[in-house]
Amino acid sequence: MNKLFNIVFIAALTFSACSKIPVVELPITTSSPKALEFYKKAMLSEQVGDGFEKRQYLDSALALDLNFVMALEMYGSQDPIKLREQREMAKSLQNTVTDAEQLMLNIRNAYRDGNMDHALENAKKLVENYSDTYESYVWLGQVQSDRYELDDAIKTLKKSIELNPDSYEAYSLLMGHHIAAGTQVMLPEEKRDIELGVKYSDELIRIRGDHGFPYHFKANVYRQLGEFEKAKPLYEKSIEKRKGLSSEATAYLVSGHNFMFGGDLKTARERYAKAIKLTKTPNGWFNLNYYLLVSYMFDNDYIGAIEHIDKIEQALESKDFDEVSLLGRKATIHWQKMVCYAHNQMEEDAYSALEQGSIFGEKRADRKSVV
């Protein structure tokens, strides 16, 4: 029997681990209870940067329910063709799911279209229609943060925490207002509070102390302050907690940053090499090699940097890149070569690398338009 059902996590079934407060979650539509279990595990993996595991769980969910809209939407394939196909399929099935899911899809599509007014409109509707769910406030807080409406975002995210003291995403966004975290929008410098950021990081560790990412996040605070020795044990804890996971590579990567900025380039490169060895995807392999390249540039060793780029280039064909991605990587490599040659006063080689990079870039654009 494959009757469609909606799972709404009502207060009687879900409680905050912190204070036993009943927690209401947004409804998710699927034809399979087991698929929903996999989906929830996938979202927990995404929460802490385990993209590979997230996609594995979503593969399992989609094997049970091919039309699982939110699983299709949240999959995030690294294959651009598969990514587009899954997003288009999710969009085509949008009318088959709950109003809450439609609003979430609208928000994500608005981001892709660069229409932040539409994103805000839908996020506000989500809160209006599902004001008893902590997740709706996370969605709105994210949009408000990205619109630089930070005072509103802080109030919204604190409301999420009122409804669920274990709202990991809310604490993560609040911390990111004070501590640099990727591309997250931060408060103006005069309003940032390092101590408050550390307090939020401790909440992340309390909620997800089973995983290394919160330790990594807190270590970043000390690294950014130049307190490299204070950051080291937290990075080591992050590595320990991520053993066997795809994000173990990330743990070694950020630890490498700490050693590099602390002046220990030898250990930094050992950490970067370990991260590269552990990565599970072609994109991960390529991106992590970039940081090893930067370690040579950081040391003004442009010959060493060029030799490293040559090694990456030789290995590219053996990696499982699709054609468009491979051309893009080749274009990037030649741009990197150009920078290194230019810094080393090798003008002819720099121009040659620039020309080759342009050729690969044009080929990628042509191929992408066909695909």
Per-region residue spans from a language model:
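Acidic, proline/glycine-rich low-complexity intrinsically disordered segments
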Residues: 18-171, 176, 198, 210-211
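TPR alpha-solenoid repeat register
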Residues: 71, 136, 170, 214, ...
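Conserved small/polar residues in nucleotide/adenosyl-binding loops
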Residues: 370-371
